[in-house]
Amino acid sequence: MHNIGIYGGSFNPVHFGHVGLAKWVIENTDLDELWLMVSPNNPLKEADSLAPEEERLAAVREAVKDIPGVKVSDFEFSLPRPSYTANTLRALRKYYPDYEFTLVIGEDNIAIFDRWREYEYILENFRIFVYPRHEAANDCAGLSHCEHTFSAPEWAEHMLIKELRFLNGAPYFDISSTEIRARLTH
């Protein structure tokens, strides 16, 4: 079974945090490949601030072209919109039946995961790797054990979950695409 990580996002724009995390994930987990899934739109974000999808796709390809095991995917571009993660994962399973998919998301997203469409389906059927999105997690970088602990949100306490793993040691990057766009407009 081929283990593929799905690291989805608008990548609007792609930045060193995305690239650094992708490199760390492929080097420090059991994934065979990490696919950066460029989303044509995010149902939880405003679409009017997005750069054209082909521009974002090209920028992500350029940013990770030299990282072995990291690929860029436009798979969601051919799916009905808006692009919901559950639909994407369902379609990936259909097209790649011999692959196992793991969702790679930020700690900020797992906190609101119960707002995602069909989040129960995702939790029950796919592994989820959670990377740090705040400074406290930076204390873990490079350590074999870590005091920064991650606990599943309260809404997940009584749910059937395939695997929910916090990526201890993953680097924290104090940057976001939202912050970059805000700086560019001022």
Predicted regions and their residues:
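Nucleotidyltransferase catalytic core that binds NTPs
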Residues: 1-186
